[in-house]
């Protein structure tokens, strides 16, 4: 209903919003909001918490879109692309090409390695055809408008591990609540990194202040919410009309 949709929108804007604040705008108690969120999570409308990061701040200086022409009898190709860590989104599309993947690229050497892997696997495909689109600017992503591209930061291994955990919280949580700094500390311990909860808190705060983490949000099953189709629209504009 409308209350559920409003709760989803509130959590997409701020995945750490308090239940009391969400309830105030809906005329619901914090307990009623909590119950609704748990039902949305149980029914897989909420897939789990995550974060939106600025890729350029963590060393991914380029974003590339790859379009692949595939045969319907080649599901193995989509499985291969899903396993590539550089491919953070993959969609089936209509038209001449049937798969669209977004790849995060660190530098030319990294791009070359990705191309070699894709070239190798595409030689085994039926059509052996793909094309690359270079995104020269990112204006908005995951509902977050981007400011001008910021200079990349040199992040340590622990900071990068924290980011990976936050991006993939759906692997770790059994509730719709985002991971606490205590839970992150324990997960890092399982990975062989001994770090206290206060240290995790300080690192997380610094990543937010530096513009690495842009938003805490949730992953939503768009189809269950009612969005049956995703459209990728290409608009040809006059390059002189925007910066």
PLM features: residue spans?
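A compositional/biophysical signature of low hydrophobicity enriched in polar/charged and small residues
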Residues: 1-243
């Amino acid at each position: 209903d409308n209350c559920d949709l409003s709760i989803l929108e509130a959590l997409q804007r701020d995945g750490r919003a308090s239940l009391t604040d969400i309830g105030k705008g809906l005329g619901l108690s914090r307990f009623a909001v909590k119950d609704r969120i748990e039902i949305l999570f149980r029914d897989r409308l909420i897939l789990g918490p995550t974060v939106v990061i600025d890729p350029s701040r963590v060393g991914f200086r380029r974003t590339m879109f790859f379009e692949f022409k595939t045969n319907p009898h080649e599901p193995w190709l989509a499985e291969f692309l899903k396993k590539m860590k550089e491919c953070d989104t993959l969609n089936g599309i209509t038209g001449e090409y049937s798969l669209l993947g977004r790849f995060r690229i660190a530098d030319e050497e990294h791009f070359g390695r990705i191309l070699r892997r894709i070239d190798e696997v595409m030689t085994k495909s039926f059509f052996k055809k793909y094309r690359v689109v270079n995104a020269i600017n990112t204006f908005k992503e995951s509902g977050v408008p981007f400011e001008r591209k910021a200079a990349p930061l040199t992040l340590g291994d622990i900071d990068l591990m924290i980011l990976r955990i936050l991006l993939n919280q759906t692997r770790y949580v059994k509730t719709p609540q985002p991971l606490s700094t205590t839970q992150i500390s324990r997960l890092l311990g399982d990975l062989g990194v001994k770090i206290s909860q206060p240290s995790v808190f300080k690192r997380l705060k610094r990543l937010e202040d530096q513009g690495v983490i842009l938003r805490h949000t949730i992953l939503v099953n768009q189809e269950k919410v009612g969005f049956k189709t995703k459209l990728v629209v290409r608009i040809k504009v006059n390059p002189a009309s925007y910066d």
